[in-house]
């Protein structure tokens, strides 16, 4: 078998669309980023990477470059990735369709095998490869590596029958996270790329929602910032307007009236839990916008939805 090796991208061509910008303006843009570079220097930034940013080629390459830039200016990015569309595609090939309850994928034994293969293999390897091709040093991890994520079977409350629980298969609830694994990589200048798969003490694999893993990882690592990339501008009200700032009380109201539902339930719950645990800055942003990660971290531009604990 002949191994295929992708050619490293030409650094001179990383952002050809910027070629027309005057040098003075480029310098001004960099100068505006300086206060944020100072603010987050040496800090851990947890990034939930998902949605179109993972499937559109231009956005994928842009994300890899953005993560490397954050590392080069002294931040410690930690990437937790999803892969819902890729899992759905793989399930179709074996004649299965995805089913979700309260934003969580119902995961039988066959689906769990697909999830492990897709997330811990194909998707993770693609992210690691791109970051490394652009000059970064990324290392892929699952929950099994170094006992990173210990999990147990999730007991999902049945909202229609109080006191009852819904069995959604091999979906995990995080018991512990071993921060030493991630910190050891950070100390050696690596960028951790984490697949949201946990393992029990007896070796059973569990599918864990990536938003849940990102939020808990931010808490345990004492991250300065948690950024969740998604396929919408942020949290929207029922009229489709962007809510730029949400408190815990406002989030409870949006849960109660059904404004937040489906896949946004675990996302917002995890974001709020992270904010309550001491993560100073929690944002949900539109990953469909090029360089949205840099815009959120390195500029004053109001972007997405900020989640507050009070």
From Swiss-Prot:
| CDD domains registered for this protein in UniProt | AAK_NAGK-C (cd04250)
In terms of Gene3D superfamilies, this protein maps to: Acetylglutamate kinase-like
The EC class name is transferase
Cite the binding residues for substrate: 83-84, 105, 207
Localization per record: Cytoplasm
InterPro entries given for it? Answer: AceGlu_kinase-like_sf (IPR036393), AcgluKinase_fam (IPR004662), ArgB (IPR037528), Asp/Glu/Uridylate_kinase (IPR001048), NAGK-C (IPR041727)
Q: Which reaction is recorded as catalysed by this protein?
A: N-acetyl-L-glutamate + ATP = N-acetyl-L-glutamyl 5-phosphate + ADP
Quote the protein name from its UniProt record.
Acetylglutamate kinase
Which classification does the entry list for the species?
Answer: Bacteria, Pseudomonadati, Pseudomonadota, Betaproteobacteria, Burkholderiales
Gene symbol here is argB
